[in-house]
C-alpha cells in the first residue's frame, strides 16, 4: 500500500511503558513533519514527470501515427516507497526509431529520478534518525556522567563535613577533659593547702590546750599546797589566836605571784 503524506501526518505512536526508554515527542514530530514535506515534494515531482511523459507520448502519437502501442502511451504508476524499474515501453515497427529511443530515455530518466529522490529521502531519513539516536545517547550519557559527578561530589562534601564535625567534637572533648583535669588538680591543691593549714592550727591549739592543762595541774597543786599550809598554820596557832587577815592576804598574793 503506497505511503501518503496524510498517513505520515495522521500517524500516532503509543507511549512506552513506565521505565522504558522512548524518543522525545517534539523531535519525533519535527522529523515526521520533515518526512511529510519531503514525501509531498516527491509526489509532486513524480506527478510533474508523469504529466511530461504523457505530453511526450501525445507528441509521439501525433508524429508517428496510430502505430504506437498502448504501453508507449501508458503513464508511469503513482509514487510508491520502493517502486521497481519498469522496462522501456515497446514501440511499433512503424514508429520512428529516434522518437522511440527518445521516449525510452525520457521514461528511464523519470524512473531513475524517482528512484534517486526516493533513495535520497530514505538516506536522509535514516541519517536523521541515526543522528537523533546518537544525540539522545550522547545526552543520556552526559546526564548520567553529570549525575554521577554530582553524587560523587555530594558524597565527598558529606564525608568532609562528617570528618570536620568529628574533629571538632574530639577537640571539644579534649579541651573539656583538660579543663576538668586542671580544675580537679587545683581543687586537690587547695584541699591539701587547707588541710595543711588546719593541721597546723590544730597542732597549735593542741599545744595551747596542753599548756592550759599543765597550768591547771600546777595551779591546783600550788593551791592545795597553800591551803594545806594555811590549815597547818591555823592549827599551830590555836583556835584562840586571832587570824591576821593581812597576813592571809599577803600569803595569797605570794601564792599567785609564785603561780605566775
From Swiss-Prot:
Keywords: Cell cycle, Cell division, Cell shape, Coiled coil, Cytoplasm, Phosphoprotein, Stress response. GO terms for biological process: cell division; peptidoglycan-based cell wall biogenesis; protein stabilization; regulation of cell shape; regulation of growth rate. Phosphorylated by PknA. Phosphorylation enhances polar localization, which in turn heightens polar peptidoglycan biosynthesis. GO terms for cellular component: cell pole; cytoplasm; peptidoglycan-based cell wall; plasma membrane. Induction: Positively regulated by the stringent response. It comes from the Bacteria. Pfam families: DivIVA. Disruption phenotype: Proteolysis of PbpB (PBP3, FtsI) upon oxidative stress in depletion experiments; degradation is prevented by overexpression of Wag31 but not the 46-Asn--Asp-48 deletion. The modification Phosphothreonine is found at residue 73. Residues 233-260 are annotated as: Disordered. Changing residue 73 to A/S: Strong decrease in phosphorylation of Wag31. InterPro entries: DivIVA_domain (IPR019933), DivIVA_fam (IPR007793). Belongs to the DivIVA family. PANTHER family: CELL DIVISION PROTEIN DIVIVA. Was identified as a high-confidence drug target. Important for maintaining cell shape and cell wall integrity by localizing peptidoglycan synthesis to the cell poles. Protects PbpB (PBP3, FtsI) from oxidative stress-induced cleavage. This is Cell wall synthesis protein Wag31. It comes from Mycobacterium tuberculosis (strain ATCC 25618 / H37Rv).
